[in-house]
C-alpha cells in the first residue's frame, strides 16, 4: 500500500514555498538520483501552497510507478515562511527472483500420461533468473537456462538510464533455442501436423539491441534492431513434409527486424491502474526480402 497522509497541515497564509531540500530515506539499494528523476518537483523549485499536496501526490505516484518500491510516502516539512523540505520515504521490494521452470511438451497432463506414459523425455526443465535493480539504477538482468525436450539459453540486460540526464536507455539481449518438435504444416481440416525426432529438429539464435528515449515523464520512444538465424532439420523441407517451409528450398532462414514504439502513459498505479491512460504506436518491419 501507499501512505497518502501528509504529516504537516499547511497554514493558509503561505502563498508560495521554495523547496529547500528533498530528503530521501529507505533506499538501501536504489540510487537517490533515480528517485529524484521521477519527481515532478525539484530542489530550488517554487510551489504554490494550494498546489503542494497535489504536487507531492503526483511525485509519490511517479516514484511508485518505477516498480522499485512496495511503499512510498512523500510529505512536506515546513521550515519557515518561505522554505519547505520534502521528505521521501520508500520501502524497497525484493529484486532477485530465481524461478524454477518446468514445461510439458504436450497439450495436457492427460495426453502426456496416456500417450507418452509420462516420459520424462517430454519435459523441459531449468531456471529463470531475474534481477530488477542490479546497480541501484533500475537496471535489469534476465537469464533463462532450460534443457530437456526444449533448450533455451538466453539473457537480456536493460539499462534505462545511461546518460547524465537520465533520459536515454539501452537494452542488449541474445539467446539460443532448440526444440525436438515443430509444426510443419496444416492438414485439410486446419489441424497442425508435427514433425518429431529424438534429436533437435529446429535451432535458432538471435541478438537484439534497443535504444529508448524518455525526455518527458509521460512520453517514451524505443528503437529496436534484431537479427535471427533459424535452421530446421533437412527432413522438414523434404517432399515428405514441407519443402516450402521457409518459402524456399533452404533449411535456413536469416532476417533482420526493425521496430519503433511510441508510448504515452499517465496512470495513478502502473501495476493496478484505476485512472489515467496509456496509448502506444508500434511500427515493425521483419525481413527485407
Descriptions of predicted regions:
Residues 15, 67, 79-81, 120, ...:
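Short coil/turn motifs at beta-sheet boundaries
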Residues 38-39, 277-289:
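C-terminal transmembrane beta-barrel domains of outer membrane proteins
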Residues 1-110, 128, 142-161, 280:
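Periplasmic polypeptide-binding modules associated with outer-membrane biogenesis and secretion
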Residues 91-267, 271, 278:
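Gram-negative/organellar outer-membrane beta-barrel architecture
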Amino acid at each position: 500500500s501507499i501512505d497518502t497522509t501528509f504529516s504537516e497541515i499547511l497554514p493558509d497564509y503561505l502563498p508560495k514555498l521554495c523547496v529547500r531540500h528533498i530528503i530521501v530515506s529507505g533506499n538501501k539499494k536504489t540510487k537517490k538520483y533515480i528517485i529524484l528523476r521521477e519527481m515532478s518537483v525539484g530542489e530550488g523549485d517554487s510551489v504554490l501552497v494550494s498546489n503542494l499536496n497535489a504536487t507531492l501526490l503526483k511525485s509519490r505516484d511517479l516514484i511508485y510507478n518505477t516498480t522499485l518500491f512496495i511503499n512510498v510516502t512523500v510529505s512536506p516539512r515546513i521550515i519557515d515562511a518561505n522554505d519547505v523540505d520534502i521528505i521521501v520515504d520508500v520501502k524497497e521490494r525484493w529484486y532477485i527472483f530465481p524461478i524454477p521452470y518446468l514445461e510439458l511438451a504436450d497439450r495436457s497432463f492427460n495426453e502426456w500420461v496416456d500417450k507418452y506414459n509420462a516420459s520424462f523425455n517430454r519435459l523441459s526443465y531449468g531456471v529463470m533468473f531475474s534481477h530488477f535493480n542490479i546497480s541501484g539504477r533500475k537496471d535489469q538482468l534476465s537469464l533463462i537456462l532450460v534443457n530437456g525436450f526444449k533448450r533455451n539459453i538466453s539473457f537480456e540486460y536493460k539499462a534505462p538510464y545511461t546518460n547524465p540526464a537520465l533520459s536515454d536507455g539501452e537494452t542488449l539481449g541474445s539467446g539460443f533455442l532448440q526444440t525436438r518438435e515443430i509444426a510443419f504444416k496444416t492438414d485439410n481440416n486446419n489441424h497442425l501436423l508435427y514433425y518429431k525426432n529424438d534429436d533437435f529438429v529446429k535451432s535458432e539464435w538471435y541478438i537484439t539491441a534497443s535504444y529508448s528515449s524518455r525526455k518527458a515523464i509521460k512520453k517514451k520512444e524505443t528503437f529496436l534492431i534484431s537479427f535471427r538465424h533459424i535452421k530446421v532439420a533437412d527432413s522438414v523441407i523434404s517432399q515428405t513434409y514441407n519443402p516450402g517451409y521457409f518459402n524456399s528450398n533452404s533449411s535456413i532462414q536469416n532476417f533482420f527486424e526493425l521496430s519503433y514504439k511510441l508510448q504515452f502513459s499517465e496512470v495513478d498505479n502502473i501495476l493496478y491502474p484505476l485512472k489515467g491512460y496509456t496509448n502506444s504506436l508500434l511500427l515493425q518491419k521483419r525481413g527485407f526480402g
